[in-house]
Amino acid sequence: MKKLESTLVNMVGVLVAVALIMGGILAFVNHVTEGPIKQQAEKTLADGIKAVMMSDNLTVTANDTIKENIEGKECTFIVHKAVDAQGNELGAAVESTTLGFGGDLKVLVGFNPKGDVLGYTLLAHAETPGLGAKADTWFQKDGKASIIGKNPASPLTVSKDGGDVDAITASTITSRAFLKAVNQAYNVYVKKNNTDANSGATTQAGVKK
């Protein structure tokens, strides 16, 4: 009986030791990879801002997080305001997320000071690979239903809903979600501009991306 108890104690001791070692290894790996992952995410965003603002020579002057209640749900937007090398306002790149066919669809949309769409890129999505790839090109300048240059003051909608934007073939849900993200990004951008104007906010130089 004592031998059995001793064996059980040894087994428990070994399991605890293994668990502690594995926990330590996982913590170390997380610590080692956390920095590079964060740096890569920041680089991806910085490159995305340049792409959607159509400028390699810009300075991001503000990164404002804005929360809006949309259809009873709190949604988070991030507005990245930018200026050119001479300090002239370029507009802003806005991060916007909506629910697509497979899950969240996160879009980065660039607007000029008038609110016209300069460019866009998908930051993340849970659509099938084919739909995600199509959404990233379908609405581009050389795509089949370009939104570049359009102003969402009149909300962008697909043809099936009475709009003038052709939906991705066999993917109306993803198209609606994408355009909704763009429309919401525009509304937040305009609201932010109005708030800044009313408060007398001025642009200050930031860190060049």
Language-model region placement:
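Flexible, solvent-exposed loop/hinge segments and secondary-structure transition points
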Residues: 2-209
